Amino acid sequence: LGAVEASRPIPWKTEEPLWVSQWPLSSEKLEAVTRLVQEQERLGHLEPSTSPWNTPIFVIKKKSGKWRLLHDLRAINNQMHLFGPVQRGLPLLSALPQDWKLIIIDIKDCFFSIPLYPRDRPRFAFTIPSLNHMEPDKRFQWKVLPQGMANSPTICQLYVQEALEPIRKQFTSLIVIHYMDDILICHKELDVLQKAFPMLVAELKQWGLEIASEKVQIADTGLFLGSKITPKNIVPQKIEIRKDHLQTLNDFQKLLGDINWLRPFLKIPSADLKPLFDLLEGEPHISSPRKFTPAAHRALQMVEEALQEAQITTNSPAKIIDWYPDAVAQPRSRIKAAVTHFGRDPDSLIVPYTAAQVQTLAATSSDWAVLVTSFSGQIDNHFPKHPILQFALNQAIVFPQVTAKDPLPDGTVVYTDGSKTGLGAYVVKDRVISKQYNETSPQVVECLIVLEVLEAFPGPLNIVSDSSYVVNAVNLLEIAGIIRSSSRVANIFQKIQAALLNRRFPVFITHVRAHSGLPGPMSLGNDLADKATKLVATALSTHAQAAKEFHKRFHVTAETLRRRFALSRKEAREIVTQCQNCCEFLPTPHMGINPRGIRPLQMWQMDVTHIPSFGRLQYVHVSVDTCSGVMFATPLTGEKASYVIQHCLEAWSAWGKPRIKTDNGPAYTSQKFRQFCRQMDVTHLTGLPYNPQGQGIVERAHRTLKSYLIKQKGSIEDVLPSVPRVAVSMALFTLNFLNCDAQGHTAADRHSLEPDRPKEMVKWKDVLTDLWKGPDPILIRSRGAVCVFPQEEENPLWIPERLTRRAPSQLQNKKDGGQVGDEDSPTRDDGSYDGRVTVGHHVYLPPTDASDAECPGVPIFHK
């Protein structure tokens, strides 16, 4: 094998030997095991063993008739510390330079070419049972990385990386991409590649790694990691649209809606897709049958070919690349993000079999054998200890089947829509019925109109809606259990649920893309419902229509529309964002988009994250102050309301009693927690059910806390015990009391320190009325602007610095020697601004990862 000295030891949790007995094997399987083990021993992969460790083996027959040896290493995996990920995603192949030459190789039997650390080999021993105990059992242990060992992929990646390191150092201009056992080398000059390739083969051979000669690709085009690399582009190997499920009008409507949405990107003229669109014509019922015509098949093949040719171009060396600091690049993350894929198995698998039955199944069934060796988690047969689950185990429960999964051929077809003006409408057989509601959310209005339809049509029913929110909610409500009154839509959901459960006939609800421009009865019905809400909405909202016309002419800001036409901020902003001329100039959303408090304790976000390595204390409850950035976390044994209350009491006793915002988890919406908040006089807010609002700040806090737990692991074990509570306390101490921002303040400083001066009062000029107003207090100063809180307004306003003047009483204090602020105030005597930033009240964006910690939070100012 060679390179044994470079093999990597595995960290173990215990030195206690583990023995899992080998189960009996049939004569046929025993013969196959003996033959396979002899072959592996001859190749140097196995050696005889007298180890006190043992785990079972078995064999499965492949489709080709050959046998495959499997080793059940789940028990051994539980005894080892898992290595962290060393390569968390696939390399981005479009980063390869254009027109460079390639050599692609594949390492043959990579795992079996890498030696196992000698001291670790006894742990991977197994037994070949003798028939009828006629002789001592033969025992062997692996000398190479075994299949199924949890750390084998990581050790393989690190081992191959070390083997490639001399080539990387010797040929610095050579691009070397390595992923598991696949290697790609790339260079502009073919001569350099031809010189590097034999040295690469020789270096790999010194490490005991052999390349598969039949898989070597030497050209400017090749297949690598599921993609085809050409001199100019990266293309997928094969794309085909699934067609076997396309049978009804509803099926084709969904497919063609997506194709029509993608058509401009694929640069396909709509005339070329007319045979496909013609399939939507005819019988109007959504369950009416549809079949492909030869012309439609050709049109769909055109779409598949266009998808196949939708290539990613490789990197041109002559192209100028703009580099941005991390904080600046965040708004461009959608555009400049790398293609990265992550995956994670569940921690446990619940099956209706005992441990002995699972072992029997693994010994007799090939499918079970593959499962138990490939699944790294725990296989159990105990459901969580929950009263509802225990009741379901003891009592036969039949879930209602009112909401159908397929269109109902004999059902009435109804199209629904709702608008923000409170107007809802539904269309049945070209007849439009409208109804006005006292709501401003389109989703809520559409929920109400769907409820109206459910009550008006008791027979078989097909509902078509352009709101994914409503479609998903209706499909979930039938088996959602008890809905607690945690928001203003809970009552509507309760009524929809009751209407579904009381129905004798089934109902089918489906989604259709709005404003698709496609032909056919489904698009026509949706357009009729949509126009019904818009026509009446125009008559009901003359102010909004006038504002649209005014903006269409002058393209003024949303704030101007709000003041001039007495609109809400939401209405004014929608007019601006829907303008085709203005949309490309709108500011990009940034990291501070989540609602934040403008002072400590004004808004906390709270959530639960899971850290499996903590064992029973894996449920870590986290709270973060959205103003100061102070974080508090409590590792507990559950996430019920009682644990949430325990976390709240500990957090509030340390940092004060806040207003809190959470998601709609069962613990947060429970009667027990609501009663607790009332008793403690704490305001608790949640988002809409089935439509959770952003909890981005606390989600980033989860990531930050976990990163510090990883970074600080082992740093305090020589002083303090390595237990979850100590680890969490150490991380919180660092985040709250050590990490500083640009002003030298920690999160604890920002949370506890109050301004040592009174609010500065200024008079300010309203540009619309040309009148001076105030004096009013300043909350925040920024470069060229101040945030003023008018006493007669509901919210603060941003005013240009040049349109403000210090209040007369404060000017007099200034002349008399009194200090309105301090000697470093950035405002001159004439009311102008000297360019420095001072703080009336800062709202900080706390550091969330390593990059933020190097350049900690800048102030985020909110209106």
From Swiss-Prot:
Zn(2+) binds at residues 551, 555, 579, 582. Its cofactor is Mg(2+). This is Intracisternal A-particle Pol-related polyprotein. Residues 596-766 form the Integrase catalytic domain. Mg(2+) 2 binds at residues 417, 446, 466, 530. Residues 41-229 form the Reverse transcriptase domain. Gene3D superfamilies: 1.10.10.200, 3.30.70.270, HIV Type 1 Reverse Transcriptase, subunit A, domain 1, Integrase, C-terminal domain superfamily, retroviral, Ribonuclease H-like superfamily/Ribonuclease H. GO terms for molecular function: DNA binding; DNA-directed DNA polymerase activity; RNA stem-loop binding; RNA-directed DNA polymerase activity; RNA-DNA hybrid ribonuclease activity; zinc ion binding. The gene is pol. Reverse transcriptase/ribonuclease HThe reverse transcriptase is an error-prone enzyme that lacks a proof-reading function. High mutations rate is a direct consequence of this characteristic. RT also displays frequent template switching leading to high recombination rate. Recombination mostly occurs between homologous regions of the two copackaged RNA genomes. If these two RNA molecules derive from different viral strains, reverse transcription will give rise to highly recombinated proviral DNAs. Readthrough of three terminators may occur: TAA between codons ATT for Ile-660 and AAA for Lys-661, TAG between codons TCC for Ser-832 and TAT for Tyr-833, and TAG between codons CCC for Pro-859 and ATT for Ile-860. GO terms for biological process: DNA integration; DNA recombination; establishment of integrated proviral latency; symbiont entry into host cell; viral genome integration into host DNA. Residues 408-538 form the RNase H type-1 domain. The record marks 546-547 as: Cleavage. A zinc finger (Integrase-type) spans 542-583. The RT polymerase active site binds 2 magnesium ions. Residues 760-809 bind DNA. Mg(2+) 3 binds at residues 607, 663. Belongs to the retroviral Pol polyprotein family. The lineage of its organism: Viruses, Riboviria, Pararnavirae, Artverviricota, Revtraviricetes. It catalyses: DNA(n) + a 2'-deoxyribonucleoside 5'-triphosphate = DNA(n+1) + diphosphate; Endonucleolytic cleavage to 5'-phosphomonoester. Mg(2+) 1 binds at residues 106, 181-182. Residues 800-840 are annotated as: Disordered. Coiled coil: none annotated. Keywords: DNA integration, DNA recombination, DNA-binding, Endonuclease, Hydrolase, Magnesium, Metal-binding, Multifunctional enzyme, Nuclease, Nucleotidyltransferase, RNA-directed DNA polymerase, Transferase, Transposable element, Viral genome integration, Virus entry into host cell, Zinc, Zinc-finger. Its EC number is 2.7.7.49, 2.7.7.7, 3.1.26.4.
